[in-house]
Curated annotation (Swiss-Prot):
SUPFAM superfamilies: gpW/gp25-like. InterPro entries: Anti-adapt_IraD (IPR023776), IraD/Gp25-like (IPR007048). GO terms for cellular component: cytoplasm. Its main location: cytoplasm. The gene is iraD. GO terms for molecular function: anti-sigma factor antagonist activity. This is Anti-adapter protein IraD. Pfam families: GPW_gp25. Keywords: Cytoplasm, Stress response. Inhibits RpoS proteolysis by regulating RssB activity, thereby increasing the stability of the sigma stress factor RpoS during oxidative stress. Its effect on RpoS stability is due to its interaction with RssB, which probably blocks the interaction of RssB with RpoS, and the consequent delivery of the RssB-RpoS complex to the ClpXP protein degradation pathway. NCBIfam families: PRK14128.1-1 (NF010726), PRK14128.1-3 (NF010728). The lineage of its organism: Bacteria, Pseudomonadati, Pseudomonadota, Gammaproteobacteria, Enterobacterales. It is found in: Cytoplasm. Signal peptide: none annotated. One of its GO terms (biological process) is DNA damage response.
Protein backbone atom coordinates (compact mmCIF):
# COMPACT_ATOMS: atom_id res chain seq x y z
CA UNK A 1 0.00 0.00 0.00
CA UNK A 2 2.72 2.45 0.89
CA UNK A 3 4.52 1.84 -2.42
CA UNK A 4 1.40 2.66 -4.45
CA UNK A 5 0.83 5.99 -2.73
CA UNK A 6 4.47 6.99 -3.31
CA UNK A 7 4.19 6.23 -7.01
CA UNK A 8 1.17 8.48 -7.27
CA UNK A 9 2.88 11.37 -5.47
CA UNK A 10 6.31 11.26 -7.16
CA UNK A 11 5.27 12.47 -10.64
CA UNK A 12 3.59 15.53 -9.12
CA UNK A 13 6.71 16.41 -7.11
CA UNK A 14 8.85 15.91 -10.21
CA UNK A 15 6.51 18.12 -12.22
CA UNK A 16 6.77 20.88 -9.63
CA UNK A 17 10.57 20.74 -9.75
CA UNK A 18 10.51 20.92 -13.54
CA UNK A 19 8.15 23.89 -13.44
CA UNK A 20 10.36 25.66 -10.90
CA UNK A 21 13.43 24.96 -13.04
CA UNK A 22 11.74 26.38 -16.15
CA UNK A 23 10.60 29.53 -14.34
CA UNK A 24 14.03 29.98 -12.77
CA UNK A 25 15.83 29.72 -16.11
CA UNK A 26 13.45 32.20 -17.78
CA UNK A 27 13.67 34.63 -14.89
CA UNK A 28 17.47 34.42 -14.87
CA UNK A 29 17.62 34.98 -18.63
CA UNK A 30 15.39 38.05 -18.38
CA UNK A 31 17.59 39.40 -15.57
CA UNK A 32 20.69 38.73 -17.65
CA UNK A 33 19.26 40.61 -20.62
CA UNK A 34 18.20 43.61 -18.51
CA UNK A 35 21.24 43.87 -16.26
CA UNK A 36 23.26 47.05 -16.85
CA UNK A 37 26.35 45.04 -15.92
CA UNK A 38 25.39 41.97 -17.92
CA UNK A 39 28.12 39.55 -18.86
CA UNK A 40 26.53 39.24 -22.30
CA UNK A 41 28.17 41.32 -25.03
CA UNK A 42 26.65 44.80 -25.10
CA UNK A 43 25.51 44.29 -28.68
CA UNK A 44 23.20 41.52 -27.51
CA UNK A 45 21.60 43.31 -24.57
CA UNK A 46 21.24 46.81 -25.98
CA UNK A 47 18.02 45.89 -27.72
CA UNK A 48 18.07 47.24 -31.22
CA UNK A 49 21.38 46.31 -32.85
CA UNK A 50 22.97 49.15 -34.80
CA UNK A 51 22.63 47.22 -38.06
CA UNK A 52 18.90 46.88 -37.52
CA UNK A 53 18.25 50.57 -38.18
CA UNK A 54 20.12 50.55 -41.49
CA UNK A 55 19.50 47.00 -42.76
CA UNK A 56 16.30 45.67 -41.18
CA UNK A 57 15.86 42.93 -43.78
CA UNK A 58 19.46 41.73 -44.08
CA UNK A 59 19.11 37.98 -43.48
CA UNK A 60 22.88 37.45 -43.12
CA UNK A 61 23.11 39.98 -40.30
CA UNK A 62 20.00 38.56 -38.63
CA UNK A 63 21.49 35.08 -38.80
CA UNK A 64 24.79 36.34 -37.38
CA UNK A 65 22.94 38.08 -34.52
CA UNK A 66 21.07 34.86 -33.67
CA UNK A 67 24.29 32.81 -33.71
CA UNK A 68 26.10 35.31 -31.47
CA UNK A 69 23.19 35.40 -29.03
CA UNK A 70 22.93 31.60 -28.98
CA UNK A 71 26.65 31.21 -28.29
CA UNK A 72 26.61 33.78 -25.48
CA UNK A 73 23.53 32.30 -23.80
CA UNK A 74 24.88 28.75 -23.93
CA UNK A 75 28.10 29.99 -22.34
CA UNK A 76 26.32 31.88 -19.54
CA UNK A 77 23.45 29.49 -18.73
CA UNK A 78 24.70 25.99 -17.86
CA UNK A 79 21.19 24.56 -17.39
CA UNK A 80 20.50 24.82 -21.14
CA UNK A 81 21.27 21.63 -23.06
CA UNK A 82 20.19 22.91 -26.50
CA UNK A 83 19.08 26.29 -27.78
CA UNK A 84 17.67 27.77 -30.95
CA UNK A 85 17.34 31.55 -31.35
CA UNK A 86 14.82 32.96 -33.83
CA UNK A 87 13.93 36.53 -34.73
CA UNK A 88 10.16 36.85 -34.63
CA UNK A 89 10.12 40.52 -35.61
CA UNK A 90 13.00 42.60 -36.86
CA UNK A 91 11.87 46.00 -38.05
CA UNK A 92 13.35 49.47 -37.67
CA UNK A 93 12.16 49.98 -34.09
CA UNK A 94 10.89 46.54 -33.13
CA UNK A 95 12.89 43.53 -32.12
CA UNK A 96 11.29 40.32 -30.86
CA UNK A 97 13.18 37.08 -30.35
CA UNK A 98 12.08 33.58 -29.50
CA UNK A 99 14.31 31.17 -27.62
CA UNK A 100 13.54 27.47 -28.10
CA UNK A 101 15.22 25.86 -25.10
CA UNK A 102 15.88 22.27 -24.07
CA UNK A 103 16.93 22.03 -20.44
CA UNK A 104 18.89 19.24 -18.87
CA UNK A 105 16.57 16.86 -16.97
CA UNK A 106 13.49 18.13 -18.86
CA UNK A 107 11.98 16.24 -21.80
CA UNK A 108 9.75 19.06 -23.03
CA UNK A 109 10.98 22.07 -25.02
CA UNK A 110 10.60 25.50 -23.47
CA UNK A 111 9.74 28.55 -25.58
CA UNK A 112 10.75 31.92 -24.14
CA UNK A 113 9.83 35.06 -26.10
CA UNK A 114 11.51 38.42 -25.50
CA UNK A 115 10.60 41.83 -26.90
CA UNK A 116 12.69 45.02 -26.83
CA UNK A 117 10.30 47.65 -25.43
CA UNK A 118 11.00 51.20 -24.22
CA UNK A 119 14.68 50.68 -23.53
CA UNK A 120 14.48 47.24 -21.95
CA UNK A 121 13.65 43.62 -22.59
CA UNK A 122 10.33 42.21 -21.46
CA UNK A 123 9.00 38.71 -21.64
CA UNK A 124 5.80 37.90 -23.41
CA UNK A 125 5.79 34.38 -21.96
CA UNK A 126 7.29 34.43 -18.43
CA UNK A 127 3.89 34.37 -16.71
CA UNK A 128 2.85 31.34 -18.78
CA UNK A 129 5.94 29.20 -18.13
CA UNK A 130 5.09 25.91 -16.45
Amino acid sequence: MMRQSLQAVLPEISGNKTSLLRKSVCSDLLTLFNSPHSTLPSLLVSGMPEWQVHNPSDKHLQSWYCRQLRSALLFHEPRIAALQVNLKEAYCHTLAISLEIMLYHDDEPLTFDLVWDNGGWRSATLENVS
